[in-house]
A protein has these predicted regions:
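Preference for intrinsically disordered or flexible, low-complexity segments
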Residues: 1-181
């Protein structure tokens, strides 16, 4: 089983707004920004061409963008995932500002990718959950809140997970979970 490690670093200065990243300003297709209420936060965008060579099992499309959002109105948070097969063109500055608890998540944290073992302890795509989190669901993304100082869920000593949906459209049914080790 292949897994893709994600290294993150806070963007400094000029960078491509369409880059793969956590938090900050998403670059969305025209008309999408109006679809989100103030209870929705932007978690991340992955430019799928960035991982195409590393996704040897073709778990995701290799063109376009995968977007991850969280509905934080109630706990546990609900995942919202969208795939767009094109080039988005609208930068949405301060997307997370309206949600007071997450207003600080308006800086871009850029992603870089590398192959890792399926049980790598850290932020990654695919593989198996690191902490012994028991599930039959297939892992899309494991996020380590303590790996960097993003300020997201940094009060837990564990992981945040996004799991693929079980239906034919595996992106539409993505589920979010937290493991407090």
């Amino acid at each position: 089983m292949n897994a893709i490690g994600i290294k993150i670093k806070k963007a400094d200065g000029n960078h491509d707004p369409g880059a793969s990243k956590f938090f900050g300003a998403p670059v969305l297709p025209d008309g999408w920004a109006e679809l989100f209420s103030e209870d929705i936060i932007f978690f991340g965008q992955i430019r799928l061409s960035d991982i195409a060579e590393l996704d040897t099992e073709n778990k995701l499309p290799h063109t376009g963008y995968l977007y991850l959002f969280l509905d934080v109105e109630m706990y546990p948070y609900q995942a919202m995932a969208f795939y767009y097969d094109g080039e988005p063109n609208v930068v949405v500055v301060d997307f997370n500002k309206a949600e007071v608890q997450f207003a600080h998540l308006n800086e871009d944290w850029l992603m870089s990718f590398e192959p890792v073992d399926e049980d790598f302890d850290g932020t990654r795509l695919f593989g198996v959950p690191s902490s012994g989190y028991e599930t039959d669901e297939e892992l899309l993304l494991q996020f380590d809140p303590l790996a960097e100082s993003t300020g997201f869920l940094d009060n837990i000593d564990g992981y945040a997970y996004f799991f693929f949906g079980e239906d034919e459209d595996r992106i539409d049914g993505i589920r979010f979970g937290i493991d407090r080790s």
